[in-house]
Amino acid sequence: CTVILGFFIARTITKPITDMRNQTVEMSRGNYTQRVKIYGNDEIGELALAFNNLSKRVQEAQANTESEKRRLDSVITHMSDGIIATDRRGRIRIVNDMALKMLGMAKEDIIGYYMLSVLSLEDEFKLEEIQENNDSFLLDLNEEEGLIARVNFSTIVQETGFVTGYIAVLHDVTEQQQVERERREFVANVSHELRTPLTSMNSYIEALEEGAWKDEELAPQFLSVTREETERMIRLVNDLLQLSKMDNESDQINKEIIDFNMFINKIINRHEMSAKDTTFIRDIPKKTIFTEFDPDKMTQVFDNVITNAMKYSRGDKRVEFHVKQNPLYNRMTIRIKDNGIGIPINKVDKIFDRFYRVDKARTRKMGGTGLGLAISKEIVEAHNGRIWANSVEGQGTSIFITLPCEVIEDGDWDE
């Protein structure tokens, strides 16, 4: 009888409690799949049922937590901003790929290190100050690549107010800062370029007002200079208006099918007639090359390049024209070469920048606005082309222009 009673107690009380203890151990290890066997409908059975319900809810909660964690990890990984998260002591625990790319560092070189140290801010900030200061600021993150980021700090705070960590959001503003810098430079250049002729005109007009108009020799000279400066201002304003239209994409391009051989020869002939002191050498294929572009816009490009070549050639002035076509890619390359003074190698790539002049005094004296090549570049690129320069000091400069084209063989029009 005693044995039977002991077996009954073991089955109805001890065994369920042992099962629940074992399941508790499994739950502590992260295993929520097992369930406690229910041996009866008494209090122990109800406890086992409640335990199973608890285990199920914990399993569901854990699954939801894991799902949210994966979703959050995916969001952080694919964010366009850099994200750095730390513990309450400021040691980095989470960093996404964009932050690593911005910093130019590997994950193992960051995890566990102090955030302020990684961002080179340990001398400027303390963790406590991040809590109090919500202002963003600019930071040079990668000097080698010239990367600038706007950094925003925030804190991770529990309901009790206890700070458990910090987050830094890094937003790449390199391009934005460059655009802003170029805008400021552009405004400064425009102001300078307008002020120079206005100052000159004002001086001559004041001299005329003070009686120089009575001088039959000086008066015509002063009026001539005033007229030249006025014309230069008109050219500058027109160039600025054209650039503004291009920037706003409101400048219409009216493309036509053009016989390029005839087109370029006509332009060369016109310059050849007006420049008797310059020799024009042509290396243009006899096969007809057809292209599609706005003839007025491209005439402006070639006029500008040829005029520059004539201006800067020296001695026995010579301007060469070489046209080559690549039928494999349906592209043609036009090379216009002068025998001028050339351009220093460190300045060649800058000649297409707005208002850039290799020799400012000389260019201004020759009537240039400093915008011609910048406009030419905009026009060529709008035609799916490319323009660049190659130069050797003392030997001259070559301007290259590539454009889409097609070579038409004899008889193609009859098919």
From Swiss-Prot:
Q: Which cofactor does it need?
A: NH4(+)
Q: Which SMART domains match?
A: HAMP, HATPase_c, HisKA, PAS
A single Pfam family it belongs to is PAS_9
Histidine kinase domain residues = 189-407
The protein's location, in the record's own words, is: Cell membrane
Enzymatic class: transferase
Q: GO biological process: any one? A: cellular response to phosphate starvation
Q: Which residues are in the PAS domain?
A: 68-138
InterPro entries per UniProt: 2-comp_sensor_kinase (IPR050351), HAMP_dom (IPR003660), HATPase_C_sf (IPR036890), His_kinase_dom (IPR005467), HisK_dim/P_dom (IPR003661), HisK_dim/P_sf (IPR036097), PAS (IPR000014), PAS-assoc_C (IPR000700)
Q: Which residues does the UniProt record annotate as the domain HAMP? A: 11-63
Record entry for activity regulation: By zinc. Zinc-binding negatively regulates WalK kinase activity and thus autophosphorylation.
Catalytic activity, as annotated? ATP + protein L-histidine = ADP + protein N-phospho-L-histidine
Alphabetical keyword list: ATP-binding, Cell membrane, Kinase, Membrane, Metal-binding, Nucleotide-binding, Phosphoprotein, Transferase, Two-component regulatory system, Zinc
Q: Which residues form the PAC domain?
A: 121-185
- All disulfide bonds of the chain are none
PTM (free text)? Autophosphorylated.
Annotated positions binding Zn(2+): 78, 81, 171, 175
| Modified positions (Phosphohistidine) in chain numbering | 192
Mind telling me which GO cellular component terms the entry cites? plasma membrane
- Describe its membrane topology: Multi-pass membrane protein
Care to name a GO molecular-function term for this sequence? phosphorelay sensor kinase activity
Q: Any other noteworthy remark?
A: Overexpression of walK/walR reduces susceptibility against vancomycin.
PANTHER family per record: PHOSPHATE REGULON SENSOR PROTEIN PHOR (PTHR45453:SF1)
Role, per record: Member of the two-component regulatory system WalK/WalR that regulates genes involved in cell wall metabolism, virulence regulation, biofilm production, oxidative stress resistance and antibiotic resistance via direct or indirect regulation of autolysins. Functions as a sensor protein kinase which is autophosphorylated at a histidine residue in the dimerization domain and transfers its phosphate group to the conserved aspartic acid residue in the regulatory domain of WalR.
* Subunit structure as annotated in this protein's UniProt entry: Forms homodimers. Forms homooligomers.
What name goes with this protein? Sensor protein kinase WalK
Q: Which gene encodes it?
A: walK
